[in-house]
Amino acid sequence: MNYVNILEKSKNFIELELVNDDHSLSNLIKEVLLSKKGVILASYGVEHPVLDPDTGRYISNPRIMLKTDAKTDAEKVLKEALKDIVDLCNKTLKEL
């Protein structure tokens, strides 16, 4: 089973779904995307979540939407944002 499903993709738009997740990662990705040059829209939505009896967490399949201007490739910006998140985590690990 995939963790990420690409629902729609063009040069300037991408919509993806994170399987069995909550607001945490989706909100972080959205915030980092909004800081990137060329991003017109970065948003996410969560359908009504369900309680996972094994973890006690409310989970859903959040959908992340990214729209960029005509000069900016949406997939490239998304990959840059994800790399920035990984870099931040690595920096934090080194400082602990």
Curated annotation (Swiss-Prot):
InterPro entries: RBP11-like, RBP11-like_dimer, RNA_pol_Rpb11_13-16kDa_CS, Rpo11-like. Signal peptide: none annotated. It comes from the Archaea. It is found in: Cytoplasm. The keyword Nucleotidyltransferase applies. Part of the RNA polymerase complex. This is DNA-directed RNA polymerase subunit Rpo11.
